[in-house]
Amino acid sequence: MSQRKYFGTDGIRGHVGLSNINPEFVLKLGWAVGCVLANGARKKVVIGKDTRVSGYMLESALEAGLSAAGVDVALLGPMPTPGIAYLTQTLRANAGIVISASHNLFEDNGIKFFSADGGKLPDSVELAIEAQLEKQLQTVPSAKLGKATRINDAAGRYIEFCKSTIPSLSRLSNLKIVVDCANGATYHIAPNVFSELGADVVPIGIKPDGFNINQECGSTAPELLREKVIAVGADIGIGLDGDGDRVILVDSLGNLVDGDQIIYIIAKDRHQRGVLHGGVVGTLMSNYGLELAITSLGVPFQRSKVGDRYVLEMLREKDWKIGGETSGHIVCLDKTTTGDGIVAALQVLSIMVKQNKALHELTAGIQLLPQTLVNLKTNNAALLASNPDVIQAVKNLEKHLNGEGRVLLRPSGTEPLLRVMVEGANASIVKQQAQMLCDDISQIDKKMTESLPST
């Protein structure tokens, strides 16, 4: 595959005003996308965004660039990422564009894309866009300029879709739900989804001001949600991130329920009903307890690289339906085309109602193992991960764990770090073993550095 200059694993992201998240680049990006998609024909693209103040600026730049390429634009306004994927399909658009930096704070923003079927753009299209970006911008003749329209009922359309992902007879009328919208794109959607299904909803994180997205709230900061669940005596808390593609839960006792546990609940229910369709996909970072719980059901479990993009790729490759990440990216391909926090939460709520069980009862079948993650500073992360002495040290520790734990080394793709993760049955022992392994690796790193020729 050709080397990418602009696209990362999930679009283009960065600090607003720095790197490529600026009006000049984004306008040309819109033009390049338009040229590649249109290829001389009239096309339509939908654009949605989260609640960051920079979203207005970037939306205008994209709109101008797309229009210059002769592409019509449908503006959705604030809309969860999975909602944009859904509306790309239903509006028969040729692509969907998301302006969001997901769970990051407001200073960051990003651009990512969906194809006409609501999936990720193929690599070939991303590479074609990159090639187009190297050319000089040329505006189509005035008679062929693209037009922009606003889809005023976008939120209502997506709300109805979310409700349709659980059985039509499902009622949430006996449930009290706290939902934290992270002052993000779900603020005007998630509370309505749950209340229209009959739940008693206590919403928080629903007052976005352009600057408070993900700020001490949402799926990455669940303490406020936990406190509210206990304070109001709720049955469940639902924590979404700024663009609505992640979800974590809190049970009535105040316990955090992460993505691994949510995957288990959904997969077990589908397996018991005979509608799971194959196995379950986690990632290299998924807790070993999830693997044990899933395989104990007689269900296959596979790990992809970290990132919802890779979970989706493996699900499609195997024609499986359920997968996700510990962070709360939950993919139900029998319902959606991408990770969807609201839809994942609805699956769990439907199971609670159908089985007449509390959330803590549904998580009883999965025992998460204590996990220690150490970020080891090194300039030789990739070399260390493949070093024979390091590999032997890992094998020695795995032998000591005796099949009741796991060791994982991951070089960071963005920082001079080697991430060392150890899982096992005993938290204090796992922590001790992780530190001992890191000490061994540090010694190997030191010897390696000393042996390298100086520059």
UniProtKB/Swiss-Prot annotation:
MF terms (GO), sorted A to Z? magnesium ion binding; phosphoglucosamine mutase activity; phosphomannomutase activity
Record-level GO BP terms: carbohydrate metabolic process; peptidoglycan biosynthetic process; UDP-N-acetylglucosamine biosynthetic process
A cellular component term from Gene Ontology for this protein is: cytosol
Question: How is its cofactor bound, per UniProt?
Answer: Binds 1 Mg(2+) ion per subunit.
Q: What job does the chain carry out?
A: Catalyzes the conversion of glucosamine-6-phosphate to glucosamine-1-phosphate.
HAMAP family listed in its UniProt record: GlmM_B (MF_01554_B)
What protein am I looking at? Answer: Phosphoglucosamine mutase
Q: In which organism is this protein found?
A: Legionella pneumophila (strain Lens)
